[in-house]
A protein has these predicted regions:
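Short, surface-exposed coil-to-beta transition loops
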Residues: 171-174, 201-202
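Short glycine/acidic-enriched loop and turn motifs that connect beta-strands
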Residues: 166-169, 220-222
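Residue-level detector of Asp-centered blade-edge/turn motifs that repeat once per structural unit
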Residues: 154-155
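Long amphipathic alpha-helical scaffold segments
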Residues: 104-151
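Structural core positions within WD40/WD-like beta-propeller blades
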Residues: 158-162
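Surface-exposed loop/turn elements that mediate protein-protein interactions on large endomembrane-trafficking
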Residues: 125-142, 174-193, 220-235
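Acidic, small-residue rich beta-repeat scaffolds with periodic aromatic anchors
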Residues: 1-114, 197-235
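Repeated scaffold domains used in trafficking and secretory/extracellular systems
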Residues: 144-151, 193-206
Length: 235
């Protein structure tokens, strides 16, 4: 079972059933841009992946907001599993247009977050629901101050950790820490801001020496679109 990879927000006026057009990104019907949820979604996704969260047989959760259901109701989508694209599921969430538009931005974000939480309960087992709830509460409580562990490695002489905060503008702000094997902090370096994909490409492979550390970039073709270079640290 793969770790969760993505959560996306869609909308559709009429009921979403087979042989009808797919929902579109949440941008017009409710006067809300799905990008205004990306800070919460990215903090949640990176926290969940670190904790090993899985939805089971798929890894992309697609929320479909529709006024065709009672406001706040969340249920399985009638399309079911797409045999050609089995890695995603649409999940329907009732969202009354007038009620939603009358909410403040904070109330709208809270409502959308809670519907995602309800959707997870339709698919995840008890252990993964507990993981989700734990991560969700941290995201809600700490927001942009939440430091999310990303990678770590222990060598013969050093231990290195990479964590990140995610700003309200969805900038990734990595922190590299190097410890000796007794847990004493030897170096802490707060990096420049990165976009999500750039962050993933930059912090790929960790190599540790006696007094040195190197973080190599991804060899993915996508790396050529960014001005990123290997990172080297000396104690």
């Amino acid at each position: 079972m793969d770790l969760i990879k993505d959560i996306r927000l869609f909308e559709k006026l009429e009921p979403d059933v087979s042989c009808t057009s797919l929902p579109t990104y949440m941008r017009g019907l409710y006067g809300f841009d799905d990008m205004d949820m990306q800070d919460i979604i990215q903090r949640l996704l990176f926290s969940l992946r670190h904790e090993g969260f899985t939805l089971g047989s798929f890894d992309h959760l697609y929320m479909n907001y529709t006024p065709s259901l009672p406001h706040g109701e969340v249920r399985l989508n009638q399309r079911g599993r797409d045999p050609y694209f089995p890695w995603y599921r649409f999940t329907d969430a009732g969202c009354d247009i007038d009620i939603f538009r009358a909410m403040s931005m904070e109330e709208q974000r809270r409502f959308l977050s809670e519907t995602i939480r309800k959707a997870v309960r339709l698919y995840a087992d008890e252990a993964n629901i507990a993981i989700f709830d734990r991560c969700y509460e941290r995201v809600v409580e700490l927001g942009a101050d939440l430091e999310i562990p990303y990678k770590e490695k222990t060598g013969e002489h050093l231990h290195l950790t990479i964590s990140t905060t995610i700003s309200d503008e969805v900038d990734f702000l990595p922190i590299v820490r190097i410890f000796d094997l007794d847990g004493r902090l030897l170096l802490e370096h707060r990096m420049r801001s990165y976009g999500r994909d750039e962050f993933i490409l930059q912090f790929r492979t960790i190599t540790l020496g006696k007094k040195t550390a190197k973080i190599a970039i991804s060899k993915s073709q996508d790396a050529r679109y960014y001005d990123i270079k290997p990172l080297k640290f000396t104690i």
